[in-house]
Protein backbone atom coordinates (compact mmCIF):
# COMPACT_ATOMS: atom_id res chain seq x y z
CA UNK A 1 0.00 0.00 0.00
CA UNK A 2 2.80 2.43 0.86
CA UNK A 3 4.39 1.94 -2.56
CA UNK A 4 1.16 2.87 -4.33
CA UNK A 5 0.87 6.08 -2.28
CA UNK A 6 4.43 7.05 -3.28
CA UNK A 7 3.54 6.56 -6.95
CA UNK A 8 0.59 8.94 -6.77
CA UNK A 9 2.69 11.72 -5.21
CA UNK A 10 5.39 11.25 -7.83
CA UNK A 11 3.20 12.50 -10.70
CA UNK A 12 1.15 15.63 -11.13
CA UNK A 13 -2.06 15.18 -13.08
CA UNK A 14 -4.00 17.66 -15.16
CA UNK A 15 -7.47 17.12 -16.62
CA UNK A 16 -7.49 18.44 -20.20
CA UNK A 17 -11.12 17.77 -21.14
CA UNK A 18 -14.24 16.11 -19.83
CA UNK A 19 -16.91 15.25 -22.38
CA UNK A 20 -20.45 13.98 -21.86
CA UNK A 21 -21.37 11.36 -24.43
CA UNK A 22 -24.81 9.85 -25.00
CA UNK A 23 -25.99 6.44 -26.14
CA UNK A 24 -29.53 6.55 -27.46
CA UNK A 25 -31.60 3.57 -26.32
CA UNK A 26 -35.31 2.71 -26.52
CA UNK A 27 -36.05 4.43 -23.20
CA UNK A 28 -34.09 7.63 -23.97
CA UNK A 29 -30.46 8.63 -23.67
CA UNK A 30 -27.78 7.01 -21.48
CA UNK A 31 -25.07 9.48 -20.53
CA UNK A 32 -21.44 8.65 -19.76
CA UNK A 33 -18.38 10.82 -19.30
CA UNK A 34 -15.01 10.65 -21.01
CA UNK A 35 -11.93 12.26 -19.49
CA UNK A 36 -8.60 13.15 -21.09
CA UNK A 37 -5.83 13.45 -18.50
CA UNK A 38 -2.12 14.27 -18.79
CA UNK A 39 0.30 13.15 -16.05
CA UNK A 40 3.95 14.09 -15.58
CA UNK A 41 6.67 14.47 -13.00
CA UNK A 42 7.93 17.85 -14.35
CA UNK A 43 11.30 16.15 -14.76
CA UNK A 44 11.20 14.71 -18.27
CA UNK A 45 8.45 12.07 -17.99
CA UNK A 46 4.94 12.66 -19.32
CA UNK A 47 1.99 10.58 -20.51
CA UNK A 48 -1.69 10.85 -21.32
CA UNK A 49 -4.71 8.63 -20.91
CA UNK A 50 -8.43 8.54 -21.53
CA UNK A 51 -11.13 7.06 -19.34
CA UNK A 52 -14.86 6.57 -19.66
CA UNK A 53 -17.37 5.96 -16.87
CA UNK A 54 -20.85 6.77 -15.56
CA UNK A 55 -19.44 9.43 -13.21
CA UNK A 56 -16.76 12.10 -13.78
CA UNK A 57 -14.40 11.21 -10.87
CA UNK A 58 -14.37 7.56 -11.94
CA UNK A 59 -13.58 8.53 -15.56
CA UNK A 60 -10.70 10.74 -14.34
CA UNK A 61 -9.34 7.92 -12.16
CA UNK A 62 -9.38 5.50 -15.12
CA UNK A 63 -7.66 8.10 -17.33
CA UNK A 64 -4.90 8.68 -14.74
CA UNK A 65 -4.25 4.93 -14.50
CA UNK A 66 -4.03 4.67 -18.30
CA UNK A 67 -1.69 7.69 -18.45
CA UNK A 68 0.73 6.21 -15.91
CA UNK A 69 1.05 3.08 -18.05
CA UNK A 70 2.05 5.12 -21.11
CA UNK A 71 4.89 7.44 -20.07
CA UNK A 72 7.37 9.05 -22.48
CA UNK A 73 10.86 10.32 -21.57
CA UNK A 74 11.51 13.81 -22.92
CA UNK A 75 15.09 15.03 -23.51
CA UNK A 76 15.53 18.61 -22.28
CA UNK A 77 18.33 21.16 -22.51
CA UNK A 78 18.22 23.95 -19.90
CA UNK A 79 14.42 23.80 -19.60
CA UNK A 80 13.67 23.73 -23.33
CA UNK A 81 13.81 21.24 -26.20
CA UNK A 82 17.12 20.34 -27.89
CA UNK A 83 15.85 21.40 -31.34
CA UNK A 84 12.80 22.44 -33.36
CA UNK A 85 10.31 19.65 -34.05
CA UNK A 86 6.83 19.14 -35.47
CA UNK A 87 4.62 16.44 -33.98
CA UNK A 88 1.78 15.04 -36.06
CA UNK A 89 -1.28 12.97 -35.32
CA UNK A 90 -4.16 12.62 -37.75
CA UNK A 91 -4.74 16.02 -39.36
CA UNK A 92 -3.40 17.89 -36.33
CA UNK A 93 0.18 19.01 -35.97
CA UNK A 94 2.08 20.92 -33.30
CA UNK A 95 5.18 22.95 -34.14
CA UNK A 96 7.58 23.34 -31.18
CA UNK A 97 10.64 25.58 -31.13
CA UNK A 98 13.22 25.99 -28.34
CA UNK A 99 13.11 29.34 -26.56
CA UNK A 100 15.54 31.44 -24.53
CA UNK A 101 15.43 31.16 -20.72
CA UNK A 102 12.71 33.38 -19.26
CA UNK A 103 10.38 33.08 -22.27
CA UNK A 104 7.93 30.71 -20.58
CA UNK A 105 5.61 28.17 -22.15
CA UNK A 106 3.86 29.77 -25.10
CA UNK A 107 1.27 27.17 -26.09
CA UNK A 108 -2.47 26.58 -26.27
CA UNK A 109 -4.51 24.58 -23.72
CA UNK A 110 -3.85 20.85 -24.31
CA UNK A 111 -0.32 21.44 -25.64
CA UNK A 112 0.55 23.62 -22.62
CA UNK A 113 -0.56 20.88 -20.20
CA UNK A 114 1.74 18.30 -21.84
CA UNK A 115 4.75 20.64 -22.05
CA UNK A 116 4.48 21.93 -18.47
CA UNK A 117 4.10 18.43 -17.00
CA UNK A 118 7.09 17.26 -19.06
CA UNK A 119 9.19 19.86 -17.22
CA UNK A 120 9.71 22.20 -20.16
CA UNK A 121 9.82 25.79 -18.91
CA UNK A 122 10.68 27.75 -22.08
CA UNK A 123 9.22 26.90 -25.50
CA UNK A 124 7.35 28.43 -28.42
CA UNK A 125 4.62 26.35 -30.06
CA UNK A 126 1.92 26.62 -32.68
CA UNK A 127 -0.98 24.25 -33.23
CA UNK A 128 -1.90 23.63 -36.86
CA UNK A 129 -4.76 21.69 -38.44
CA UNK A 130 -7.16 19.76 -36.22
CA UNK A 131 -7.62 21.37 -32.81
CA UNK A 132 -9.38 18.45 -31.11
CA UNK A 133 -7.82 18.13 -27.63
CA UNK A 134 -6.96 14.42 -27.99
CA UNK A 135 -5.30 15.04 -31.38
CA UNK A 136 -3.31 17.99 -30.00
CA UNK A 137 -2.08 15.94 -27.01
CA UNK A 138 -1.12 13.00 -29.24
CA UNK A 139 0.65 15.29 -31.74
CA UNK A 140 2.59 16.98 -28.91
CA UNK A 141 3.68 13.64 -27.44
CA UNK A 142 4.64 12.42 -30.94
CA UNK A 143 6.91 15.46 -31.32
CA UNK A 144 8.43 15.00 -27.86
CA UNK A 145 9.12 11.31 -28.59
CA UNK A 146 11.00 12.23 -31.77
CA UNK A 147 13.35 14.66 -29.98
CA UNK A 148 17.03 13.68 -29.92
CA UNK A 149 19.76 15.22 -27.79
CA UNK A 150 23.28 15.93 -29.09
CA UNK A 151 24.76 12.75 -27.59
CA UNK A 152 22.24 10.51 -29.39
CA UNK A 153 22.86 12.18 -32.77
CA UNK A 154 26.65 11.99 -32.32
CA UNK A 155 26.42 8.29 -31.45
CA UNK A 156 24.28 7.60 -34.54
CA UNK A 157 26.86 9.32 -36.75
CA UNK A 158 29.81 7.66 -35.06
CA UNK A 159 31.30 10.95 -33.89
CA UNK A 160 31.83 12.80 -30.63
CA UNK A 161 29.70 15.75 -29.56
CA UNK A 162 32.63 18.15 -30.13
CA UNK A 163 32.95 17.15 -33.80
Curated annotation (Swiss-Prot):
Matches recorded under InterPro entries: Ribosomal_Su5_D2-typ_SF, Ribosomal_uS5, Ribosomal_uS5_bac-type, Ribosomal_uS5_C, Ribosomal_uS5_N, Ribosomal_uS5_N_CS, Ribsml_uS5_D2-typ_fold_subgr
GO biological processes: translation
Keywords, sorted A to Z: Ribonucleoprotein, Ribosomal protein, RNA-binding, rRNA-binding
Domain S5 DRBM: 11-74
Keyword Kinase among UniProt keywords: no
Top-rank taxon: Bacteria
Cellular component aspect of the GO annotation: small ribosomal subunit
Pfam family, one: Ribosomal_S5_C
GO molecular function: rRNA binding; structural constituent of ribosome
HAMAP family: Ribosomal_uS5_B
Subunit structure comment from the entry: Part of the 30S ribosomal subunit. Contacts proteins S4 and S8.
Assigned protein family: Belongs to the universal ribosomal protein uS5 family.
Annotated domain remarks: The N-terminal domain interacts with the head of the 30S subunit; the C-terminal domain interacts with the body and contacts protein S4. The interaction surface between S4 and S5 is involved in control of translational fidelity.
PANTHER family listed in its UniProt record: MITOCHONDRIAL RIBOSOMAL PROTEIN S5
Known function: With S4 and S12 plays an important role in translational accuracy. Located at the back of the 30S subunit body where it stabilizes the conformation of the head with respect to the body.
NCBIfam families the UniProt entry points to: rpsE_bact
Protein name, per record: Small ribosomal subunit protein uS5
Primary gene name: rpsE
Amino acid sequence: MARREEETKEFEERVVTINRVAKVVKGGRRFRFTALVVVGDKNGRVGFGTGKAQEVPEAIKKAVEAAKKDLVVVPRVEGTTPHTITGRYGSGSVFMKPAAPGTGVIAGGPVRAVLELAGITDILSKSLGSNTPINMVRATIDGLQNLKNAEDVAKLRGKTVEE
